[in-house]
Amino acid sequence: MNLRPLHDRVIVKRLDQETKTASGIVIPEAAAEKPDQGEILAVGPGKRDDKGAQIALDVKVGDRVLFGKYAGQTVKVDGNELLVMREEDIMAVVQK
């Protein structure tokens, strides 16, 4: 991947959702919503405060995160659909 996020932005790859419900019903791809979970592939260096000091991000590469349905900007890189979003658009980190 040749994308390097700037400031407080992160690159996220959406994780595939289950296409079958707990009761065994298969959800067709056309009816499925976009997943709201993803894995962080790259992080920017962080914002700068009023004095110019860098504020590091709370997320790191490999974190599994939750984000809003309309969060981020979709980009295609090497045939993969990725999201570029600000750290503030991330709602939570999924603990393993």
From Swiss-Prot:
Chief subcellular location: cytoplasm
InterPro entries noted in UniProt: Chaperonin_GroES, Chaperonin_GroES_sf, Chaprnonin_Cpn10_CS, GroES-like_sf
Statement: the UniProt record of this protein carries the keyword Flavoprotein: no
Alphabetized Gene3D superfamilies for the sequence: GroES chaperonin
Keyword terms of this UniProt record: Chaperone, Cytoplasm
Pfam families named in the record: Cpn10
Entry keyword annotation includes Cytoplasm: yes
Cellular compartment(s): Cytoplasm
UniProt GO molecular function: ATP binding; metal ion binding; protein folding chaperone; protein-folding chaperone binding; unfolded protein binding
Any one GO BP annotation for this protein: chaperone cofactor-dependent protein refolding
One Gene Ontology cellular component annotation held by this UniProt entry: cytoplasm
NCBIfam families per UniProt: PRK00364.1-2, PRK00364.1-5, PRK00364.2-2, PRK00364.2-4, PRK00364.2-5
Role of this protein: Together with the chaperonin GroEL, plays an essential role in assisting protein folding. The GroEL-GroES system forms a nano-cage that allows encapsulation of the non-native substrate proteins and provides a physical environment optimized to promote and accelerate protein folding. GroES binds to the apical surface of the GroEL ring, thereby capping the opening of the GroEL channel.
Similarity annotation: Belongs to the GroES chaperonin family.
UniProt subunit comment: Heptamer of 7 subunits arranged in a ring. Interacts with the chaperonin GroEL.
UniProt protein name: Co-chaperonin GroES
